[in-house]
Amino acid sequence: MAKDIKFSADARAAMVRGVDMLADTVKVTLGPKGRNVVLEKAFGSPLITNDGVTIAKEIELEDHFENMGAKLVSEVASKTNDIAGDGTTTATVLTQAIVHEGLKNVTAGANPIGIRRGIETATATAVEALKAIAQPVSGKEAIAQVAAVSSRSEKVGEYISEAMERVGNDGVITIEESRGMETELEVVEGMQFDRGYLSQYMVTDNEKMVADLENPFILITDKKVSNIQDILPLLEEVLKTNRPLLIIADDVDGEALPTLVLNKIRGTFNVVAVKAPGFGDRRKAMLEDIAILTGGTVITEDLGLELKDATMTALGQAAKITVDKDSTVIVEGSGSSEAIANRIALIKSQLETTTSDFDREKLQERLAKLAGGVAVIKVGAPTETALKEMKLRIEDALNATRAAVEEGIVAGGGTALITVIEKVAALELEGDDATGRNIVLRALEEPVRQIALNAGYEGSVVIDKLKNSPAGTGFNAATGEWVDMIKTGIIDPVKVTRSALQNAASVASLILTTEAVVANKPEPAAPAPAMPAGMDPGMMGGF
């Protein structure tokens, strides 16, 4: 395919147009008075959201060069979301600010490599300064406060706080759609382990790339499944029940995996295969945990069992299983309460006798998986559109809350980024490195400027007053008051803030150091088909 190539200023200008189109769409959502964006969907009602990464992923531009710029900013939002679960709009605003300030200087003759060095040095200093002012989060009220700020709902904050209290900060919390109008919290027995599907063709939801199995059977074995004939009798029995199947095995390869995938694609039956969690003896113990939780039996040579001889009675069962590319969650296994209690007692006794810190940690993980359960936040709303929007907000809030517990919190509303300006400004750099530092200094102001603008205030006035205010004091854009941000509950997880800055600086630096851009040439429009010989053009008028 032929290529279009742009160089130096033309290349950067085209990419920046794409950066601006995406960033200008996303940044209207920032802050307590941020607006919503309506996204057209191929099927069903449009999606109304203020979630930065969701908006960024939807944007595709017609011009290939502009689209590359937009996609780089979308990558910033996605990366920030993957690391911290929130802060995607802040990351987008920071990227746009660094790109614009940097481009001015590059156009004026500054060296992009020197600018990049200065940006990297200034960003590292800002991140260390953010970590230094972070305050730890502990206690139910503090956790609820973080969640409430992110979701813009005190009720959601309470649900997330209670869920984390009941299943632990690292416990499994899932978000589902409720059948009613009200949002509610439910804790059910469940287990999560860090193994995802072996093939992406096994997913049932192509948008979220997850496989949801309702009321499935579960085959548990420490053997490798390579020959489909070994499990064919069992598959035929499961097929008769019209229920899905989860296969947990040492591995599924050879002819077995493509055969399972092909039958899944054809709709013959719904099957998902995952690798068994853990290694060695620990793997055997975890498989036994899963078997007891689900009421199944581990097919293993240790018990003299062979796959080809396995019957339906060896299969475990559960109310629901969700599998993504990295993990599997089993909810409401069918194992007996007595067997599960005995297994928990056994693990507790092993905890008391072990002398190894590593073994103790792994035993505690297994105990949490068996005893902790899974918290389910069931989201209710009057309409499907409102339901989707609420789910996205709760997902963001949950991720932000976990990030806050992990690394602590700082003053929200962009205040923390203004606070660290003093540390960055103190860096003694020269030449283009100093220019890079100054670019970051200007970018650190941008989130506050945008939050104020979205709330109807003049950003520059707010920033000037903020720089001269006592530490911790900030601008509450929701009320227009100057308050102690942390005491008022306007807080951001430091992990979210520093991830947004790091990812923005990284991608913006790449754009500034770009000297050539290569894109596919648009395909020429196909010519209209020739009219058959002898046909009178006037004959077409009747259609």
Swiss-Prot record:
Reaction catalysis annotation: ATP + H2O + a folded polypeptide = ADP + phosphate + an unfolded polypeptide
Enzyme class: isomerase
GO annotation, cellular component aspect: cytoplasm
Positions contributing to ATP binding: 29-32, 86-90, 413, 476-478, 492
Subcellular location, record wording: Cytoplasm
GO biological process annotation, one example: protein refolding
First-listed, main subcellular location of the protein, grouped into a coarse class: cytoplasm
PROSITE patterns from the UniProt entry: CHAPERONINS_CPN60
Protein purpose: Together with its co-chaperonin GroES, plays an essential role in assisting protein folding. The GroEL-GroES system forms a nano-cage that allows encapsulation of the non-native substrate proteins and provides a physical environment optimized to promote and accelerate protein folding.
Record-linked NCBIfam families: GroEL, PRK00013.1, PRK12849.1, PRK12850.1, PRK12851.1
UniProt subunit comment: Forms a cylinder of 14 subunits composed of two heptameric rings stacked back-to-back. Interacts with the co-chaperonin GroES.
Record-given protein name: Chaperonin GroEL
Organism: Streptococcus pyogenes serotype M6 (strain ATCC BAA-946 / MGAS10394)
